[in-house]
Amino acid sequence: MTRRRLRFGNGLDLELALGDDAPAGAEVLVVPQDVNLIMGEVTVIEETGETPGEAVAAATAASTPRAQGSVVVGPRRPGLPLVFQAVVYDFQRSPPTCEEHVFAALLTALEEARTRGVRCLGVQPVGTAHGGLSAERFLNVLSQVCYSAAELGTSVRRVYVLLASAEELGRYETLLSEAMSERRLAP
């Protein structure tokens, strides 16, 4: 269910949608992730005698942290959108994210989508939890990325911002309406 739309250039639309899952037709889902790749679902990599907690701890200790602002592309799952994990959090820092890392991750995600010929993607509000960006800053950063993608040329035609609650949807609708009004007033 979408309620508001902001158009960039001649064909990239930013829309608000209610729900955490990508809407029908979305080929990619962009989700938040931390540098150690421990947020979200943990899948079984191999069978061991360790408990799940021990296995995760061992895998985390053995892996190299990812750079903030990067994107990790998940494995293909039949019938589901491809998952792009936007690495925006580092819980060893305070605050754990910043606008620069969110911008870099979103820009990388849209560029990766372009190289894959993706036309539609869903984006969870990455970087807005854990004392990160405000909804207004996130929407501003995403708008900048969409504008850049539209100006430089992209296969992406629709970006859905996936909002978890009706309250959050209402807040983003207000912010998007204000942004649309400001665009009309700009010279």
Where are these regions (language model features)?
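Glycine-/small-residue-enriched capping loops at alpha/beta junctions
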Residues: 1-115
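Phosphate/ribose-phosphate-bearing ligand recognition and processing surfaces
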Residues: 90-187
